[in-house]
């Protein structure tokens, strides 16, 4: 995802996660548990206890750069937050304190870094950012989320199985907030909300909230296409369409006139059925502060011939990367991918198995349905829904494969789909190292 900081909202994380951040060099904002409510004296004593326990446990993790000592989005309470700040400083005075605010004011504010959850529209309905406050480090702790830019409330549910036009807006909103955050050196940084879908009863669909640029299985959605392109092409060239190449009922004319492609390459050439359709350059006029702005193209296309799309990416005159997409579902297939080819049989080690419906080139197929039925042979167990219904998750799903404690050997997992046939993947379970 090419991010350099993560906000652990709104509770301290497992130490294994912080260990991984230390190893990866991923900066961490860690904060105490809670959301808005700050209760009475006894409740506040518990919040103070949480600050002390968090700092004591995690202060030796070099990845941590901010202690969140406020209850997320809570009203100011100088008496409480003076105590929590002093508690953190007494245990670790090397790091600043902060906590997300919904008030754009330093009245009765006590922390070191002003962190603002900014959900408002600019006059044109795009992402708005409040001006920095003078005299204090100013940080955006949240933006985008499910906020309805150009409207009211938090109603944008970026479901992979939902409205396609809305899905396509998510990446643009994230691009806008980072472009505008980079426009003023007085902004210390931007953390957009959020990385992953999560369970919730507020603003949710079937018990899941959908502000994540990846789904609950950690599989990137269209919204992640902006982030995936923000990397030096010498490290990893990227071409990520912010659309599905599909001509079904939801998108009969294909991606449409305002189609977006995120890439870190200098020039894109689009071929439809081997005919040159467009030559594109990044839109630096609309996104002047992004290192790798998006590309825009008219892709309102007659889909009756089930055309193929090829996107060639260039640096100068050198072809760096080419990606192809098929509109013909007859060649679709079921894809299985595991994160790890080997796991330890220590009773807890597991790996993710992702299954998805893709076209013949491996691109995701919009609104693919049907059930995936899994079977397993060997010293392992399936953790998750089986069979798995793909329709509700937009043709993508996942389970976890855990090795049985103390057992070693080859684990074979077979996935069966009524129209796409079966696929097989293997994992090796090894006994733990002594």
Identify what each model region corresponds to.
Residues 192, 197-199, 204-254, 258-335, ...:
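Catalytic cores of secreted or luminal carbohydrate-active enzymes
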Residues 304-308, 348-350, 406-410:
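Extracellular Ig-like/FN3 beta-sandwich strand-entry sites
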Residues 5-252, 257, 283:
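Substrate-binding/catalytic cleft of secreted carbohydrate-active enzymes
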């Amino acid at each position: 995802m090419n991010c350099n900081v993560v906000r652990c909202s709104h509770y301290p994380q497992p130490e294994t996660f912080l260990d991984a951040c230390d190893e990866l060099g991923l900066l961490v904002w860690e904060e105490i548990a809670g959301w808005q409510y700050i209760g009475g004296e006894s409740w506040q004593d518990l919040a103070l206890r949480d600050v002390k326990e968090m700092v004591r446990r995690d202060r030796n993790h070099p990845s941590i750069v901010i202690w969140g000592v406020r209850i997320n989005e809570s009203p100011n309470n100088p008496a409480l937050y003076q105590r929590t700040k002093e508690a953190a400083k007494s245990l670790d005075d090397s790091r600043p304190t902060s906590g997300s605010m919904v008030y754009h004011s330093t009245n009765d504010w006590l922390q070191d870094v002003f962190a603002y959850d900014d959900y408002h529209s600019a006059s044109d309905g795009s992402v708005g950012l409040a001006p920095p406050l003078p005299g204090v480090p100013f940080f955006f702790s949240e933006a985008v989320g499910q906020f309805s830019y150009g409207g009211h409330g938090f109603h944008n549910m970026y479901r992979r199985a939902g409205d396609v036009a809305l899905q396509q807006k998510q990446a643009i909103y994230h691009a806008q907030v980072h472009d505008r955050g980079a426009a003023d050196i007085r902004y210390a940084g931007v953390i957009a909300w959020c990385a992953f879908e999560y369970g919730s009863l507020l603003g949710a669909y079937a018990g899941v909230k959908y502000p994540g640029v990846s789904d609950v299985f950690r599989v990137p959605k269209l919204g992640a296409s902006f982030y995936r392109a923000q990397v030096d092409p010498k490290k990893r060239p990227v071409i990520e369409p912010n659309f599905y190449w599909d001509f079904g009922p939801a998108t009969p004319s294909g991606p449409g006139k305002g189609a977006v492609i995120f890439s870190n390459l200098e020039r894109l050439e689009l071929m439809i059925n081997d005919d040159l359709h467009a030559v594109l350059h990044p839109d630096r006029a609309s996104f002047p502060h992004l290192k790798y702005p998006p590309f825009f193209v008219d892709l309102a296309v007659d889909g009756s011939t089930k055309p193929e799309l090829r996107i060639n990416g260039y640096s100068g005159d050198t072809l760096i990367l080419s990606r192809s997409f098929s509109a013909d579902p007859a060649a679709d297939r079921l894809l299985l991918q595991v994160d790890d080819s080997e796991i330890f049989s220590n009773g807890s080690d597991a790996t993710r198995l992702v299954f998805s419906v893709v076209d013949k080139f491996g691109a995701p197929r919009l609104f693919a349905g049907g059930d995936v039925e899994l079977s397993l042979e060997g010293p392992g167990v399936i953790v998750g829904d089986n069979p798995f219904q793909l329709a509700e998750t937009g043709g993508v799903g996942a389970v976890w494969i855990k090795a049985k404690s103390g057992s070693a050997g080859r684990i074979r997992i077979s996935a069966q789909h009524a129209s796409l046939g079966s696929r097989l993947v293997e994992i090796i379970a090894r006994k733990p190292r002594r």
